[in-house]
Regions:
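Flexible, glycine-rich active-site loops centered on histidine and acidic residues
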Residues: 136-170
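Short glycine-rich phosphate-binding loop at a beta-alpha junction
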Residues: 79-87, 260-269
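Claisen-condensing/thiolase-fold acyl-transfer catalytic domains that form or cleave C-C bonds
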Residues: 60, 64, 90-91, 104, ...
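Condensing-enzyme catalytic core mediating Claisen C-C bond formation in acyl metabolism
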Residues: 1-55, 159-239, 243, 247, ...
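Short beta-strand segments
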Residues: 14, 87, 118, 143-149, ...
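Short acidic, glycine/serine/threonine-rich loops at helix termini
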Residues: 22-23, 95-97, 155-159, 337-341
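Acidic-glycine-rich active-site phosphate/pyrophosphate-binding loop
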Residues: 35-42, 93-107, 145-151, 214-221, ...
Length: 356
């Protein structure tokens, strides 16, 4: 599916990461695996530090903290928010929507729209597409997009495949109308036949959580995981990214009439260092144009990795008047892969703060 939008822009991005930090070296003892092989994994995949919420901290807590930061500094006013979109796979509750919980905790106006979207690693691009569609309405002038997950709470400390990878984070992106006729183009594809490559098997209506679904099982290579935990078929995801993402981006560039070297930065979801390096190699994109340092500092926070990459690497540049042509690309659970061409700059906020 292809999208084209005009007269809209991102005006600010805030990243929120928990203060609690863990290191891969400290956690190696949890894995029933030779230390030498764990260290090799660290080197190849880029595992190092990651941020985790304390027990009991939820998506709404990170989100409310970040929005309050923007309110307190005059970067956003409560009554300006006409729509609030939350993209998460770890909501506070099945019901009510966590976006409504956030609205209530902050005392936002009733004349607004709240919406939860259950999407994973492509959720930043999908959230932006939804925000731009809402801004087509006369009554909506400013949208807040929150991407947030606390999926560390759904991982097994004994599963080396996924546990050292996952981090918790939130991002808040402010999207509004723009007077300049600057085109934004996006492409989106989905393949539900491969939905089991990245999933949490138990906990929903199909397989409710029970004492049995909490039992750890040896799932191979001495990794222990329960059905209540997040699982990832690493080889399937790797092959999916290498095969599907490059042609999607190439097709988007062709549709926009832009050569690949006209893109200042490719800001992609960051599953791990190795996978992103291989994607850059496949597309013949210089590493300097594809930032790849989020996982080693914060962990893989799902749909937050693109906004964290922006705030971590481009903060000073994006606060200037000069705009940059960027390509955003998200890919993962669903399976879903999405890309967007958008000019970024003139941001009133582009920073990362810590949730205490």
């Amino acid at each position: 599916v292809n999208f084209t939008f005009k007269d809209k822009r991102i005006s600010g991005i805030l990243g929120v990461v928990p203060a609690r930090e863990r290191s891969f070296v400290e956690e190696m003892k949890n894995f029933n695996f030779p230390e030498s092989r764990s260290l090799k994994l660290k080197e190849v995949m880029g595992y190092d530090k990651r941020r985790l919420v304390e027990p009991g901290v939820c998506v709404s807590d990170l989100s409310v903290f970040g929005l309050q930061h923007l309110f307190d500094r005059g970067l956003l006013a409560r009554d300006e928010i006409d729509a609030l979109i939350l993209v998460t796979q770890s909501p506070d509750y099945f019901m009510p929507p966590t976006s409504n919980v956030i609205q209530g905790r902050l005392g936002l106006k009733q004349d607004m729209m709240c919406m939860d979207i259950n999407q994973a690693c492509a959720g930043f691009v999908i959230g932006l597409i939804q925000a731009f569609m809402l801004l087509e309405q006369e009554s909506i002038r400013k949208v807040v997009l929150i991407n947030a997950d606390v999926l560390s709470r759904k991982t097994s400390p004994k599963d080396r495949n996924i546990y050292p990878l996952i981090g918790d984070a939130a991002s808040i992106t402010v999207i509004e109308r723009d007077t300049r006729n600057c085109a934004i183009q996006a492409s989106l594809k989905m393949d539900g036949t491969r939905n089991e490559a990245l999933m949490i098997p138990a906990g929903g209506m199909r397989l409710p959580s029970t004492a049995e679904t909490a039992v750890l099982e040896n799932v191979g290579d001495n990794n222990l995981r329960a059905k209540d935990h997040l699982l990832m078929d690493g080889s399937a995801i790797f092959n999916f990214v290498q095969l599907e993402v490059p042609p999607l981006i190439e097709g988007l560039l062709t549709r926009a009439g832009l050569p690949i070297d006209s893109i200042d930065y490719f800001l992609c979801h960051q599953p791990n260092r190795f996978m992103l390096q291989k994607l850059a190699d496949k597309m013949k994109v210089p590493y300097a144009k594809m930032p790849n340092n989020v996982v080693e500092r914060f962990g893989n926070g799902g749909s937050t990795t693109i906004p964290l990459a922006i705030t971590l690497n481009l903060s000073d540049k994006l606060k200037s008047e000069q705009e940059m042509q960027t390509c955003l690309a998200g890919f993962g659970g669903g399976l879903v892969w999405a890309a967007m061409l958008i000019r970024l700059g003139r941001l009133t906020c582009c920073e990362i703060i810590e949730y205490p």
